[in-house]
Amino acid sequence: MLKVAFQMDEDVVVGRDVSVKLVEEAQRRGHEVFFYRPTSLAFVCGELVAEAFSVRVGADSLHFHDKTRLPLGKLDMLFVRQNPPFDMRYVTTTYLLERLDILMINNPKAIRDHPEKLLPLSFPKFIPPTLITESVSEISAFYAEYGDIVLKPLYDYGGNGVCRICGRADVGAISSAMVERYEAPLVAQQFIDDISSDKRVVLLGGRPIGAVRRKVTAMGEIRTNLRVGATPEATELSDREREICHDVGMLLSSVDILFAGIDILGGHLIEVNVTSPCGILEINQVYGKTLERDCWDYFEYALLHRSP
């Protein structure tokens, strides 16, 4: 039996959240599972602890009981799965966690060093025309060149704050308001007019274990995130998409990011989700799989073969 903890948000939903499915599979294997909120993390006189609860998955909710002061260094495995925003509070947890000598999914230093919308910059041949800035004049010039762009906050997630700018839109006013709201640079990319090609690929140990096409169902919606209601469908990966998965997977494996999700649109790499990857529930649904079992098989293998 392994002693396992999940650092995650409390508002996860049974049947809709990958973290819950991973907890459920851990329970099925007989592991002891704890939950704690990131805000309960504390470095106390040389020891990293958290106010944690034993957790079990019920029919429609998680059940927390037996509150305890959990020494994280005595765990066998820790899942770092709280959602962005990727702010200084989030970053601070990665500085504290990287002191632990246990298996973490994912490596907190790697999470910190590879923000999800910046990581694709390491693969320039795969990304669409991209601008990262908080300069309104630079965004306006980018819009003037491409005429149809997508603007999104750099450190949020799940499609939050994403907007398309085209036609006679006041790009200056929109970008200025977004910079003020998010207090961070923005990502601007040329709009890819082929949202029917949007895919989520799940990588485990740097290799793709499943993919779905994400179909937009709402009229006028450009966001294909599963969190905002896109419908998953079966798909095949093209040669270029497999090349993207291979190259990204090589990088992720080299920095101990064991579990990740890749967003591909029109043959372009858009984002790499390393904080709280989702997608396995939808792949299970479409293909009748149980990927949480494959994930746990790999995590246990990684623990067994972990270098001292």
Swiss-Prot record:
What are the binding positions for ATP in this chain? 143-198
Q: Which reaction does it catalyse?
A: gamma-L-glutamyl-L-cysteine + glycine + ATP = glutathione + ADP + phosphate + H(+)
GO: which molecular function terms?
Answer: ATP binding; glutathione synthase activity; metal ion binding
Q: Which domain of life is it from?
A: Bacteria
Q: In which pathway does it act?
A: Sulfur metabolism; glutathione biosynthesis; glutathione from L-cysteine and L-glutamate: step 2/2
Chain coiled-coil ranges: none
Q: Which UniProt keywords apply?
A: ATP-binding, Glutathione biosynthesis, Ligase, Magnesium, Manganese, Metal-binding, Nucleotide-binding
Which pairs of Cys residues are joined through disulfide bonds in the record?
none
- Which cofactors does the annotated protein need, by name? Mg(2+); Mn(2+)
Q: Which residues make up the binding site for Mg(2+)?
A: 271, 273
Q: Which InterPro entries match?
A: ATP-grasp, ATP_grasp_subdomain_1, Glut_synth_pro, GSHS_ATP-bd, GSHS_N, PreATP-grasp_dom_sf
Q: Name the SUPFAM superfamilies on file.
A: Glutathione synthetase ATP-binding domain-like, PreATP-grasp domain
Domain named ATP-grasp is located at 117-300
One Gene Ontology term, aspect cellular component? cytoplasm
A Pfam family that this protein carries is GSH-S_N
- Entry's cofactor comment: Binds 1 Mg(2+) or Mn(2+) ion per subunit.
Q: What is its EC number?
A: 6.3.2.3
Protein family membership: Belongs to the prokaryotic GSH synthase family.
What name does UniProt use for this protein?
Answer: Glutathione synthetase
